[in-house]
Amino acid sequence: MKNTTLYTYRDYFVIRGGKPLTGKVKISGAKNAALPIMFATILTEEPCTITNVPDLLDVRNTLLLLRELGAELEFLNNTVFINPSINSFITNQEIIRRMRASVLSLGPLLGRFGRAVVGLPGGCSIGARPIDQHLKFFKEAGADVEVREGYVYVNLKEKRRVHFKFDLVTVTGTENALLYLASVPEESILENIALEPEVMDLIEVLKKMGAHVKVEGRSAYVKGSENLKGFTHSVIPDRIEAGTFMVGAVLTDGEILLENARINHLRAVVEKLKLIGGEVVEENGNLRVFRKESLRACDIETQVYPGFPTDMQAQFMALLSVAKGKSRIKENIFEHRFHHAQELNRLGANITVRGNTAYVEGVERLYGSEVYSTDLRASASLVLAGLVAQGETVVRDVYHLDRGYEKLEEKLKKLGADIERVSEL
């Protein structure tokens, strides 16, 4: 694995606000598509090549996990080459605890070996993020499931067709089920599945491997194979990174050309951005984003895709904190996902949280201060706020950002931001 500098947990950003973001930026591949696709390689014994893979902590931890399981791999210039000579069904607990997506090893390990031992996952601390739907599916598939001492033990008696309906829409639950069912020769049915672009990207990979997958509404019909093939695939662009830069353009009153962004993945974000005062124009496959009118209040409610994404809620809160009027943001996907509200208030925002709703009264300006990141998207909102805050803003614990944004400060610098990463050894 070709090495690039991995940042430390003590890194922080120093931002001097007041400069508009102008220029062009290339959007990286989607982490949330890359991770399940990398786990899909467990299902085959043939070589796999994945391009447009972002160089992030979660990606590197996934590669470490695959290597621990026996895979031979190389990560070079955003391309992953994997020879999945997997010889173990027991995952490394230390790696597992670093990221929530590690639970996606369950499905393919069970598909390949008929059993799996996976540590309970880590990642962002956003309320309750249980894996009960994953385990319920595996039980329905005929597996014995036991959770003890921080591990999930899954043993399969025999592979059989499954007809399973999720109690709620879950992205990783859908992906785990698809990864397992790709190895089951009989046709299975999943109901109430997630339809996120990242899920659809995984389905495209499973089709390349030899599985037959048909999606109708929120149902998926899956007929797998016990001889899945290797594949070559390019990961879709990161719609959340694109959305973050879109907010940055409108918030700072700049103008950004987003390369490698797909507007069809961003309809709900574009709709709200325009209501607030932004403009998004398609140009030769790219997106030009700028502020068209004075910022105004807007109500937002997070929903499963194709609704407004929970992963853009924090960034829009930063934007609405300086928009004229009173806005209401209702969070329906995760509980306790308003930690950034308190930190934005340190910068002078006027935000009140009641239950799963935040009430944002726009202020004339924000002022620099020291703030602390609590999760990936909260970190992004604080950086965005720092870009327009008067004076100097220090954003602590930016290791959260390194889990989901590739070279964020470098991209912001190229757009004109005054931002510096400081490492405390």
UniProtKB/Swiss-Prot annotation:
One of its GO terms (biological process) is UDP-N-acetylgalactosamine biosynthetic process. One of its GO terms (molecular function) is UDP-N-acetylglucosamine 1-carboxyvinyltransferase activity. Its main location: cytoplasm. Transmembrane segments: none annotated. NCBIfam families: murA, PRK09369.1. Belongs to the EPSP synthase family. MurA subfamily. Pathway: Cell wall biogenesis; peptidoglycan biosynthesis. Signal peptide: none annotated. It comes from Aquifex aeolicus (strain VF5). This is UDP-N-acetylglucosamine 1-carboxyvinyltransferase. It is an enzyme of class 2 (transferase). Cell wall formation. Adds enolpyruvyl to UDP-N-acetylglucosamine. Its EC number is 2.5.1.7. It holds the Pfam family EPSP_synthase. GO terms for cellular component: cytoplasm. The modification 2-(S-cysteinyl)pyruvic acid O-phosphothioketal is found at residue 124. Disulfide bonds: none annotated.
